[in-house]
Every structure is written in C-alpha cells, then in structure tokens.
C-alpha cells in the first residue's frame, strides 16, 4: 500500500501522489497538502499539478486552477487532465473561443483523446452542470466508441438529468466492455430494483416511491411538493420545467449509489436540477432527520440551479436552501448549537470569502454542518441589510458568470473582506448572549463528575451554559428533579435557542409532566418543537398533553410535525384521524384513515369502517359506500358497518336525482 511505501521512504513522490488521490476521492482536505509534498520532491510531477488544479477548480478558485494546470503543461504540453482544467475554466467563463482553441490543440495531438472530454464531463459535474456533462461524454463516445469509461460517465449523467432508459443503455454498454467498474455495476443493480418502485404523479411532480411506502409518503409528499413549488415560484419569479422527478430511497446505501455510485454518502438529499433524490424516512433512525424539510431544501436547489443556469456556488445555494426551510415551517432548517458557537469562538469557522471550502473540502467532520448553518446566516444578513431582492440579483450575477467577489461588489456594493467583518458583527449581535455563555472547556470540566461536583462548578460559574446544563442533567439523572430545575432554567436563560436532545426544554418538560403540571410541560415542549425539526418523541408527548388540556387542534398540529419526521407509526395516524374528527376536519381525517390502511393494520375491517365513516362525514357518500363494502367483505357480520351501509342507502334514497 501507499502507507507501507511511505513507511520505508516518507518522501516517495508517487506514494504521496497516491495518498493525495485517495484523499481527493474521500473528500479529505489533506489531498492538496499531500500533492504539494509530492511536488516538493519532484516539481515536474504532472499528475500532482493536475490534481491540485482539479481541487482548485472544485473550490471555484479559478485563477489558482489555471496556474496549476499551466505548471503541468510546462512539463507535458499534451497533459489531457491539465488541458481539461483549462478548458473547463474557459467554458465556465463563457469564453467559447478560448475553450474551442484548447480542445482543438488537444485533439490535434491525439484525435481520439477521450480523456479530455471525460475530464471536462467530470469537472462539469463538480460544478453541477449535468446537462453539459452529458454533452461532453457524448463527444468522448463519438471519438472512441470503445471508451467504456466515457459510456459510463454518459450513462450516470443521463440518469442525473432524468433520461433513465437512455442512461441504462449507456451503462449496460459500459458494463459489457468493462464489467469490473464498481460504480457502473452498483448503478445497474440499483436500476434493476426500480421495478419495486411505483411512479405517483401529481400536477408538477413524478414521485418514484418504494412500493410498500408509496401510499404513505404520497399522502404528504404530493401536497407538500405542490405547496413548495407555488411558494418558491412566487418568491423567485421563476418556474422550473415540469414534471420534476423525485426519487425516494428506503435504503441509504441505494441513495448513495444513485448519487455518487458508492455506498457511504452522508447527505440526506441531492438535487440535480429537475431530478431530486433523497432518503426515505425509513432509511434513517426515527428522530434523526426531517424528510419534509429535506425535500423542501432540495426543491429550493432546483430553483437556484435553474435561475443561475447551474452556476450558483455551493455555499450560496446551500445557505439559501436552509433559509427556505426556515421560511417553510416553524422548526425546519438548521439551528444554532453549542458546538457551532464554540467553533466560532475558536475561529474554526471559515470567512465568507472561503466558505465554499467548508462544503467541498471540509477540514474536520463537523465543518460541513457548520458551513450549512453559517451560509444560511450569511443569506439572512444579506436579506436583512439589502432586501430579499438582493438574493435574486446575486443569483442573476452568478448566471452571468460572475464570481463571488464580483457579485458582492456589484450587487451588495462591498468587497467580500469587508462583508466578512460585517458578518463578525452580525454574529455578536445575533448570538451575543449565548456566545458569552459558551466557555472554553478544560479536561477537568469534561470528566464525568457526580451531581455534587457538577453543582459546585455550576455555582461558581453561573454564566457558563455548559456548567449549568451539566448540573441540571446530572441532578435529573440522579433523580433529584427539584434541585435540577434552577440549573436547567438558568441554562435555558443563557442559551434559549438550544433545543437539542437533553436540552433544558426537554428535561424541564419531563419534570413538569411527572409533577402533573401539564401546562408548564406543554410550554416547554412547544418551545422545543418550534426549534428542533427532529423532535419526534417530544411532538408526540406534546400532542398527548395538549389533548389532555382540551386542545385537539394543537394536539393535531404536533402530530402533523411528527409525520414529517417519521410517518410509519400506525398509532400516530389513528390518533391524528381521531383528532381531526374532533375538530371536524373530515378531509384530513379521510387522509389519515387511508394512511392507516396503507400501513396494514391488524383489523382491516375496522380500518375500512373508520375510513367509510370519515368519507361519510366529509360528504362523500360514494367513497363511504365503497369503503364500508370492503369492511363487510372482510367481516360480513360487522354490525356498525351494516348500520352505516343502511344509513348510506337511506341517505341515497332521500337524495334528489343527480345528487351525490
């Protein structure tokens, strides 16, 4: 292995290059440093210069990418990878004359140089230009019909733009020529599973849903999608072409294969433009992600990509998409965490001028999630100081080929370094209190201490959020609930935005519920569920409490939030149906009764009867009759179903001719 070689010779340039390539594949920030180490030993190592050029291009550092590519070409004027980087930069800058000149130079040296077009296609993908990737791959195939890699790149990108059958044909051709390509094999295996999926259409969407989950997910996803499209279209003054294809995978490994070809992708969803792919709620542990906000986020990308002609930088579209989540529903979208504020205080967050690096080449595991939230705050600040229209004008600037510094100057009237300083001030303004309450931790602070030690530390540090929360948690876990309350209240006062697991809201709600103080418990849970989009158990608990307090509408709203976290618990839908019956919202009750049936209840006769009753109360006698007959097919002696059928017949007999 490369590591074994480096143990013998720590300066072996090819081993360093191999490590750099592995790091590039894994998205690790060490890739560039390893390539530079290889060049320190051998400055003429063309492949290392090309690798650095690719990394700079991916980070949208175009001038640095050109310099690295030109260094490679000084040693080898025919280096296809370097020519591909130069051609990509010219292509992205809309300099078609220079682009075609580079392509001509490359093909004069090697008329069948598919590597050039393969490289162009792959770099188009890195810049989210999927349609262009298809065209470049087609050019490669036209040059050499036996370039199996080119056929594979073509097929993968045809799938990304929704050309499913054409993509399959290209991938099968690639596999016949090279049956050892793992990416191609995995993707073909995934396509074979599509026969188990159902296509569910709505007005502007085509949902590709796993058969067993289709009826449950479609009941919520279809109306959510149409609502999101309308709201985003109104905000952006733009309407993506329809139908938009949405693929929802019950296996995260399958989602990873669909998006990158290999299992292991950490994302929840991906937008290729008018094709979206995402995890089903069944692909993750309950309470770990919100599939409703994930869909809204990915659809927002479809608008941003379309408006900018797929030229929006990663940091800006991610920040805007998180902002759109927050606008969509209370609690949706990333929220501030103690770890984020600690990273800010430790100067581990990137300046806005380098924020893209946090997405494409993170330096530590949490940096991607921190960058999502930071980017949303940047967009929030821009909207506050320059108006919502400024965000639209920035998208237009990117569409016109401007880089981030130029967009800041032209649209916001500031250079990006000055904006960095404004963002620093905004962080203090927005989170001044919590920032002051996040203190540096020492080894002594983080050791497991007993309740009395935790209380002593918290008493000495009344303005330290972590010390207060630790004291409250430790006392809570020790069963000393009354003593825990003042520490939890103080922690909440110091950092009211924090609502993660084990937050003050969570523990206080449990304390008040145990004591029978349901109103105080409800108040804590209402605040927590307004901040935490993944709080499934807390929403269910809040619903139970609000129902006890005589608030069926509030109880139903809490369960609606829970549905977008995990919709596959049958008891949740039975409760929600009963709540909508109490509030007289019979169409929603019908939806819930249909979902109960989709989840295969033990007593299907009862489930059909309850559906029939909901249809009857909603005024749909025909659907009620069909459902009650299904109940009687299963249980012919079901008395309540028989009585309902008689009521339906009686109502039908008294309905004027032509009535429903």
Task: Please report, for each region that a protein language model flagged, where it lies by residue.
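Pan-zinc metallopeptidase signature
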Residues: 352-470
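Short coil turns that delineate tetratricopeptide repeat
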Residues: 10, 43, 77, 111, ...
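Juxtacatalytic substrate-recognition/specificity segment
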Residues: 7, 33, 40, 67-68, ...
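Structural signature of tandem alpha-helical TPR/SEL1-like repeats
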Residues: 1-4, 24-37, 58-71, 92-105, ...
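Helix-start (N-cap) detector for alpha-helical repeat units in TPR-like alpha-solenoids
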Residues: 13-14, 46-47, 80-81, 114-115, ...
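Conserved structural position within tetratricopeptide repeats
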Residues: 3-7, 37-40, 70-74, 104-108, ...
């Amino acid at each position: 292995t490369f590591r074994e070689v480096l143990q013998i010779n720590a300066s072996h340039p090819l081993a360093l290059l191999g490590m750099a390539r592995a790091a590039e594949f894994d998205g690790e920030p060490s890739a560039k440093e390893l390539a530079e180490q290889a060049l320190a030993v051998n400055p003429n190592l063309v492949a290392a210069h090309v690798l650095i050029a690719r990394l700079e291009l991916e980070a949208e550092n175009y001038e640095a990418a050109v310099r690295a590519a030109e260094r490679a070409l000084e040693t080898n004027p025919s280096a296809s990878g370097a020519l591909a980087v130069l051609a990509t930069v010219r292509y992205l800058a809309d300099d078609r004359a220079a682009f075609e000149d580079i392509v001509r130079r490359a093909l004069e040296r090697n008329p069948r140089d598919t590597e050039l077009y393969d490289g162009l296609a792959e770099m188009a993908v890195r810049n989210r230009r999927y349609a262009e990737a298809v065209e470049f791959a087609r050019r490669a195939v036209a040059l050499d019909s036996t370039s199996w890699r080119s056929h594979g790149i073509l097929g993968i990108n045809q799938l990304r733009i929704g050309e499913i059958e054409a993509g399959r044909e290209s991938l099968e051709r690639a596999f016949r020529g090279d049956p050892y390509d793992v990416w191609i094999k995995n993707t073909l295996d995934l396509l074979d599973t599509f026969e188990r999926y159902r296509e569910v259409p709505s007005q502007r969407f085509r949902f590709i849903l796993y058969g067993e989950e289709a009826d449950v997910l479609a009941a919520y996803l279809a109306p959510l999608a149409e609502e999101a499209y309308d709201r985003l279209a109104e905000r952006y003054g733009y309407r993506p072409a329809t139908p938009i294809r949405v693929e929802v995978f019950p296996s995260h490994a399958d989602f990873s294969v669909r998006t990158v070809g290999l299992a292991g992708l950490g994302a929840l969803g991906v937008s290729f433009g008018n094709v979206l792919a995402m995890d089903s709620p069944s692909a993750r542990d309950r309470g770990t992600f919100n599939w409703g906000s994930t869909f809204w986020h990915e659809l927002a990308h479809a608008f941003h990509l379309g408006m900018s002609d797929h030229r929006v930088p990663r940091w800006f579209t991610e920040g805007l998409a998180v902002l759109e989540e927050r606008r969509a529903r209370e609690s949706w979208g990333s929220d501030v965490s103690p770890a984020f504020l600690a990273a800010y205080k430790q100067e581990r967050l990137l300046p806005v001028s380098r924020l893209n690096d946090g997405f494409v080449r993170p330096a530590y595991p949490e940096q991607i999630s921190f960058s999502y939230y930071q980017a949303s705050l940047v967009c929030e600040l821009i909207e506050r100081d320059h108006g919502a229209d400024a965000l639209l004008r920035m998208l237009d600037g990117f569409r016109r080929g401007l880089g981030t510094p130029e967009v800041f100057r032209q649209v916001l009237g500031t250079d990006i370094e000055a904006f960095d300083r404004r963002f620093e001030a905004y962080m203090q303004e927005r989170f001044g209190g919590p920032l002051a309450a996040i203190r540096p931790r020492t080894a002594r602070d983080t050791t497991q201490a007993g309740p009395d030690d935790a209380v002593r530390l918290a008493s000495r540090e009344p303005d330290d959020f972590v010390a207060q929360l630790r004291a409250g948690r430790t006392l809570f876990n020790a069963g000393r609930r009354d003593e825990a309350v003042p520490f939890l209240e103080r922690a909440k006062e110091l950092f009211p935005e924090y609502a993660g697991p084990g937050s003050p809201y969570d523990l206080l709600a449990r304390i008040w519920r145990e004591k029978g103080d349901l109103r105080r418990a409800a108040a804590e849970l209402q605040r927590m569920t307004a901040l935490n989009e993944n709080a499934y158990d807390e929403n269910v608990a809040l619903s139970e409490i609000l129902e006890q307090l005589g608030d069926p509408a509030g109880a139903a709203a809490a369960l609606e939030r829970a549905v977008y976290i995990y919709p596959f618990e049958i008891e949740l839908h039975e409760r929600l149906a009963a709540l909508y019956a109490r509030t007289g919202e019979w169409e929603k009750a019908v939806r819930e009764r249909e979902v109960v049936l989709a989840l295969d209840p033990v007593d299907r006769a009862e489930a059909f009867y309850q559906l029939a009753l909901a249809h009857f109360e909603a005024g749909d006698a025909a659907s009620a009759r069909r459902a009650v007959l299904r109940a009687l097919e299963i249980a012919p002696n079901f008395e309540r179903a028989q009585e309902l059928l008689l009521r339906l017949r009686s109502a039908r007999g008294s309905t004027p001719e032509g009535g429903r």
